[in-house]
């Protein structure tokens, strides 16, 4: 069985510097966040990190939408 992909690894597949899509912009900004928890794959730790440090994320709804896509991708 393969190892579960981290949320960050998934999020990097959504990067697109030319896109105005909110998830793409989140991914672009997370790429430059050197403290982003790159190995995390659980909602609570990522949510807590972003609430405290994700000044580049205008709304936690964007994270929630990205998390839903991540869960769909992982299932």
Swiss-Prot record:
Report the superkingdom from the record.
Answer: Bacteria
* Name of the protein in question: UPF0346 protein LSL_0716
Query: So what family is this one in?
Result: Belongs to the UPF0346 family.
Q: What is the lineage of its organism?
A: Bacteria, Bacillati, Bacillota, Bacilli, Lactobacillales
Please name the NCBIfam families in this protein's record.
PRK13672.1
Gene3D superfamilies from the xrefs? Answer: YozE SAM-like
- Please give the organism: Ligilactobacillus salivarius (strain UCC118)
Record's Pfam families?
YozE_SAM_like (PF06855)
């Amino acid at each position: 069985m393969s190892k579960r992909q981290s949320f960050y690894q998934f999020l990097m597949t959504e990067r697109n510097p030319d896109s105005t899509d909110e998830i793409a912009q989140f991914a672009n900004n997370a790429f430059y966040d050197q403290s982003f928890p790159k190995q995390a794959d659980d909602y609570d730790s990522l949510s807590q990190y972003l609430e405290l440090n994700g000044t580049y994320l205008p709304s936690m709804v964007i994270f929630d939408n990205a998390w839903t896509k991540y869960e769909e991708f992982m299932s």
